[in-house]
């Protein structure tokens, strides 16, 4: 972790929101991270059904993490990583990598598979996969100077050295293959989460709130394979986010935008594909 880079980024200062220089530098004093893991699982299968569930825990010591410019500024607006001019205006924040003393993560993964048998046609396959985050505990220094473990699940986490952590994610896949055609439907769901960043009067007047809504999108696709004397041709069309759902709004002043780590803002996308194999 010795590389360094500089870019512009938005942060919320004491009484203003600004774009400033954010430098990220290496840390030669990093220690290797270690962890202990536990998993408990169950698999049930009968005929066309299959269900699996897995509970997991990971306990990290010295997990390597990169500092958040906003978290540094929130914790100490005049700290050693903060650069200001002679008038006190914020002009830069310097971040680096560090060893987080302790991190505890736990959650549950599950998967369900089912084959629908159709009398005179090919079967339809269904698969549902999901993850539920229970805990993502990281230390935080309280107002009295003590370290306290905070659960980051279900939060935007603008003020900590981590990122958004929706509690639930769910994906469902349905496929039907018949006479050389493959038809697919994919459903993607991301749970909503809270945003504890204070919202200004302007932001509230524009409809922003302290919750990022859940996000549900559907993707559909069709594919046709044609065999030739030498090789085959595959035609495909896919409509991503078929209902043209907009990314949930996120108040992250000075940005009035979306969560770049979680949501795709591009709306409906149409992809065409032609492939020749020989």
Where do the model's predicted regions map?
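C-terminal beta-signal and adjacent terminal beta-strands/loops
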Residues: 60-61, 134, 187-201, 224-278
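Extracellular loop and loop/strand-boundary signature of outer-membrane beta-barrel proteins
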Residues: 25-28, 94-99, 154-161, 204-210, ...
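Outer-membrane beta-barrel proteins
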Residues: 46-48, 59, 113-119, 124-126, ...
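Flexible, surface-exposed loop regions and adjacent strand-edge segments
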Residues: 1-8, 67-77, 142-151, 199-205, ...
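Outer-membrane beta-barrel signature, preferentially recognizing the C-terminal barrel domain
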Residues: 1-52, 58-59, 85-108, 113-118, ...
């Amino acid at each position: 972790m010795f590389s360094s880079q500089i870019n512009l980024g938005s942060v919320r200062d004491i009484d203003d929101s600004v774009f400033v220089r954010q430098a990220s530098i290496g840390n030669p004093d990093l220690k290797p991270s270690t962890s202990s893991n536990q998993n408990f699982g169950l698999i049930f299968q009968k005929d066309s059904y299959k269900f699996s569930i897995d509970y997991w825990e990971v306990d990290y010591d010295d997990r390597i993490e990169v500092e958040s410019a906003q978290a540094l500024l929130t914790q100490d607006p005049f700290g050693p990583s903060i650069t200001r001019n002679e008038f006190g205006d914020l002009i830069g924040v310097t971040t680096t990598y560090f060893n987080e003393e302790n991190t505890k993560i736990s959650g549950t993964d599950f998967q369900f598979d089912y084959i629908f048998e159709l009398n005179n046609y090919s079967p339809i396959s269904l698969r549902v996969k999901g993850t539920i985050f229970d805990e993502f505990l990281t230390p935080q220094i309280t107002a009295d100077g003590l370290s306290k473990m905070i659960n980051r699940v279900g939060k935007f986490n603008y003020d900590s050295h981590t990122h958004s952590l929706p509690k639930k994610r769910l994906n469902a896949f349905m496929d039907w293959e018949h006479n050389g055609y493959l038809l697919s439907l994919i459903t993607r769901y991301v749970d909503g989460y809270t945003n504890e960043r204070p919202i200004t009067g302007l932001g509230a007047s524009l409809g922003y709130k302290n919750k990022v809504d859940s996000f549900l999108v559907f993707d559909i696709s069709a594919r046709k394979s044609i065999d030739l004397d030498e090789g085959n041709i595959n035609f495909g069309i896919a409509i991503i986010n078929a209902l043209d759902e907009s990314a949930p709004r996120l108040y992250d002043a000075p940005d009035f935008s979306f969560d770049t780590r979680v949501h795709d803002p591009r709306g409906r996308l149409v992809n065409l594909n032609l492939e020749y194999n020989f």
